[in-house]
Amino acid sequence: VAEEAKVVAQEMGCIVYSTYDVGVAGIHRLFEPLKEVIEKEVDVVVVVAGREGALASVVAGLVDIPVIAVPTSNSYGFGEKGVSTLMAMLQSCSLGLAVVNIDGGVAAGAVAALIANRAGKFRIRS
C-alpha cells in the first residue's frame, strides 16, 4: 500500500522520501524520520498504518504539514480488515489530517502529489 502511494506520487513528478517500521509501539523510532521530514521541508506526509491506526494521529499532532492517513487491511480481532483502523483515523482530533479508504495507496499518492505539485508552483513564484 505504501509502495502504491510512492509510485503514484513519483509518476506525478514528486520527489518521495520513505521511512518504514516507525509505529507507535516503538515510538522512539518515529522521531528521527520526523526530524528529516521537517528539515527537508516536505509538502505533505502520507502515513500508512494498520492495527489501531494511531500513527497518523501522532504524526499529525507533531508536524505542521498536511498528513494523509491510509488505513490498511492488516488488522486483527474485532477490527479485522482495517475497519477499526479506518474508524480510528476518521475520529482523530489531530488537525491537518485527511483519511483515504482502506488500502487506498493509489488515492493517497495522488492526493499527496496534487498538494505537493500545487505547493511547488507557489514556491517557484516566491
Where are the regions that the model predicts?
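Glycine-rich phosphate/diphosphate-binding loop of Rossmann-like nucleotide-binding domains
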Residues: 1-35
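N-terminal small/polar loop signature for handling phosphorylated ligands or for N-terminal nucleophile
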Residues: 22-48, 54, 58-63
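C-terminal binding/interaction regions
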Residues: 35-37, 44, 66, 71-126
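Alpha-helix C-terminal capping segments
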Residues: 10-12, 58-66, 114-117
